A protein has these predicted regions:
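Alpha-helical transmembrane segments and their immediate juxtamembrane cytosolic regions
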Residues: 1-355
Length: 355
């Protein structure tokens, strides 16, 4: 969902820029954003690696997540800087950065009316990922990086060729929306419910299967076949079909739901709209990049504490989880401090930035 929304916003924002100021201006804006993401991606890696040197036992605690990466071994940093090795929980930004590099050309093609060609190309690239064609490149690269059979080579969590279909679907939708080529009120007509019911049926079909695979209820001989279709790293067919069903269903509820004659559907639409417009969630959304970087620090800190202490009770784990969630919004609160606390007694003047 977040990958699609990122593509949607990218398409909406930068297509307007291209239509107003030209391709090169829009391209430079997108690449500038990609460079900003790269700086954040490298900053969080360097911060964690610095903490690894000063915290007792951090090397052992984070070994499975960081591998052999160390500030004391500069050669281990080059694969990270080129995204060939991505430490655990630091693999989202590299994915976005790569997509942003190609985004200007994709947006421009959509503006020029070639959105269908873009969609077909994206689908073919996704199919290539499902068939493993990317291994023609990744397997030799992995062997070269490892240098030895027992050493770690290429380390990535997401198949870029598989997940791109979600991002660029968002790009297409966002660009066409900015060009006023799509009238969403007509696309999601409350009187046209066939696709909405189909989406619900598909989601309900996969729900028990998801529970069965998550809790080990699915027989091995079934899982052997089903698992090939449910590879998250490749955004396999199960994920693509589920995403399409849920995305369509949510969009129908949010756009067509408020106009539907059924009071229950209108109530569901109202509830979801209230949830998505909740001020706290909007606050987090405005500063999602900083929240992401901060959340990586929190996760590594919690994992370090867990590794350095005896077995924690369920109550303690719950308290740690609540505490981690409580501090998650700190970067957003700090960046919006003037807006939030400007008129607050005692702290209002302190929060204001000097002119």
């Amino acid at each position: 969902g977040f990958v699609f929304l990122s593509g949607l916003l990218t398409g909406m924002v930068y297509s307007r820029k291209m239509m107003k100021d030209g391709y090169s201006v829009g391209r430079d804006k997108i690449w500038s954003r990609a460079l900003e993401l790269y700086r954040y991606a490298m900053a969080i890696v360097l911060i964690i690696l610095a903490l690894q040197l000063v915290l007792p036992g951090a090397i052992a605690a984070w070994k499975n997540w960081l591998g052999d990466a160390s500030l004391l071994d500069p050669s281990s940093l080059a694969p990270i800087a080129t995204f060939l090795v991505q430490p655990t929980f630091m693999d989202i930004l590299p994915q976005y950065i790569v997509y942003m590099i190609f985004a200007p050309a994709v947006i421009w093609l959509c503006i020029r009316g070639h959105w269908l060609g873009v969609a077909i190309g994206s689908l073919l690239v996704w199919l290539a990922a499902q068939l493993g064609l990317h291994r023609i490149v990744t397997y030799p690269l992995d062997a070269w990086l490892a240098g030895a059979p027992d050493e770690e080579g290429l380390r990535v969590s997401f198949n870029l060729l598989g997940w791109q279909i979600v991002f660029f679907a968002g790009i297409i939708a966002g660009t066409l929306t900015s060009m006023k080529k799509i009238e969403w009120q007509k696309v999601f007509d409350p009187k046209r419910t066939t696709l909405a019911w189909t989406a619900l049926a598909v989601a309900l079909f996969f729900l028990p299967l998801r529970i069965a695979t998550a809790h080990g209820f699915m027989p091995g001989f079934v899982l052997e076949k089903f698992g090939l279709m449910e590879i998250r790293a490749d955004f396999g067919p199960v994920y693509l079909i589920n995403f399409a069903a849920v995305a369509y269903g949510m969009a129908w509820i949010l756009i067509a739901g408020p106009r539907h004659e059924n009071a229950v559907i209108r109530k569901i639409a109202s509830t979801l709209t209230s949830l998505f417009t909740f001020n706290f969630l909007q606050l987090l959304g405005r500063h999602s990049l900083q929240i992401y970087v901060w959340h990586v620090l929190i996760v590594y800190a919690v994992y370090y504490v867990d590794a350095r202490t005896p077995e924690l009770s369920q109550l303690t784990k719950t308290a740690i989880t609540i505490g981690a969630l409580a501090v998650l919004a700190l970067p957003a609160l700090w960046r919006d401090r003037e807006k939030i606390f400007a008129n607050a007694p005692y702290v209002g003047n302190w929060m204001k930035t000097p002119a």
